């Protein structure tokens, strides 16, 4: 059941870049709008479930949300710099490394042969992520607007933010449903701090991205439910299989250009991501 639960974030999060791309706006507008949607989801969940919110849950939730605002804001920045189909695979690989290391080193989730199987699975996942991001240097239509300096810096910061967002909650060992609303408060605070000078709250695109936040909220809830059942390393790795949705979606729905050679890279890379994810799930099962 935990494995099935972990696939829900893959679908939800794999759609985030596509939805935000359709909703439009700058990285700051998208991040603020998304956090508004996440807060709406968090408040609705709290109203239905009425979980107890202790000071510990508030602290962990807000800190986790602040980390998330760094992760998501910088990922949107990278998407603007180098495109969704290039950002998502690289970001996925970096997040998988960070969360697998956290699961093993901080939470001692793998034992004995699990080290070898888990390590091999993560390597396969990372190889798939890298393949999907490779470019065809002979393509005369390569975008001159890609800014890899900005993109890589944003991805490094994004990975730190995303790693902190999951590690804090897992380390705190708090109820998944209870932490969602405080976490959304932290996300909104972080987004407001980052975007304040641009006043994104006066732009319609910000409010359109509330939809993005609602979809993210669904994935977030099921992500932490899965972590409690099958561990951080496996749950997070499975959740990142949404790379297939975001990569192919950005090509076919948003029209990001790919040559035949790049499409071969994408197909092989996506297969490797699926194989690595399945291997991790079988290891835990």
From Swiss-Prot:
Keyword field contains Oxidoreductase: no
- Predominant location: membrane
Show the GO MF annotations. Answer: carbohydrate transmembrane transporter activity
The positions making up the signal sequence are none
Keyword terms, alphabetized? Cell membrane, Membrane, Sugar transport, Transmembrane, Transmembrane helix, Transport
Q: Which GO terms describe its cellular component?
A: plasma membrane
UniProt xrefs under Pfam families: Sugar_transport
Tell me the membrane topology, using the record's own terms.
Multi-pass membrane protein
InterPro entries per record: Sugar_transport (IPR010651)
List the subcellular locations: Cell membrane
Q: Transmembrane residues, as ranges?
A: 2-21, 31-48, 55-72, 112-134, 147-169, 179-196, 209-228, 233-255, 264-283
The answer to whether keyword tRNA-binding applies is no
Q: Which domain of life is it from?
A: Bacteria
- Similarity field: Belongs to the GRP transporter (TC 2.A.7.5) family.
Q: What is this protein called?
A: Putative sugar uptake protein lp_2503
